A protein has these predicted regions:
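Non-catalytic interface/linker regions that flank or bridge core catalytic/transmembrane domains
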Residues: 1-39, 156-163, 168, 179-181
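Divalent metal-dependent catalytic cores for phosphoryl transfer on phosphate-bearing substrates
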Residues: 38-51, 56-181
Length: 181
């Protein structure tokens, strides 16, 4: 891990233990999400809410105003509410990804019907790999648009560089900001 990535992860760690939402954040979220979607957003851990707000604000700073994209920015990690990660589990995922990306994917593909029950040491990897699908299901239950649901479901998916549908272009924008924050 290079020094800039280490500093980035250190900043993320500090934010995970010290974040608080402002009234302005609450108003911004409420201006984009429906009341039931706001409730879903509020179920996320504070650090996940903060991350989602950073992703949202970066997209807006880039001039993005597509409602589906902004909804996905706020709810892309909502699947993690199914089995909230502890701080040490987040750290473990980062370390293992740095050493063996394929291991995270392999260990995380184990089929699980009840994520809240966990699976011992695999639990964190399962959440890391499967939260997009869980989040898409939750967003769909809260009447998010099909495009927002698709963006949430696919936010960790690798996109072929030659594909240029409107949906994939929005997904690239979400992934770019999410990956850097």
């Amino acid at each position: 891990m290079n020094s800039s990535r280490f500093l980035y992860r250190s900043r993320q760690f500090w934010q995970a233990i010290s974040t608080r939402s402002s009234q302005q954040d609450v108003e911004l979220v409420s201006s984009i999400l429906s009341p039931v979607q706001v409730e879903l957003f509020q179920r996320m851990q504070k650090s996940e809410q903060f991350h989602s707000l950073v992703v949202l604000n970066e997209l807006r700073n880039r001039g993005e105003d597509n409602t589906d994209l902004l909804t996905a920015a706020l709810l892309h990690d909502v699947g993690k509410t199914q089995a909230p990660l502890r701080l040490w589990e987040r750290v473990m995922i980062v370390i293992v990804r740095a050493i063996c990306q394929d291991c995270v994917q392999k260990w995380g593909t184990f089929k699980i019907d009840h994520p809240e029950k966990g699976l011992g040491w695999r639990r964190a990897f399962i959440v890391a790999e499967q939260h997009p699908a869980w989040g898409a299901d939750l967003a769909a239950e809260c009447d998010a648009s099909p495009l927002a649901v698709s963006l949430i479901a696919r936010h960790q998916e690798k996109i072929h560089p030659e594909v240029s549908s409107v949906d994939d272009n929005l997904l690239r924008k979400l992934q770019s900001v999410d990956d850097n924050n």
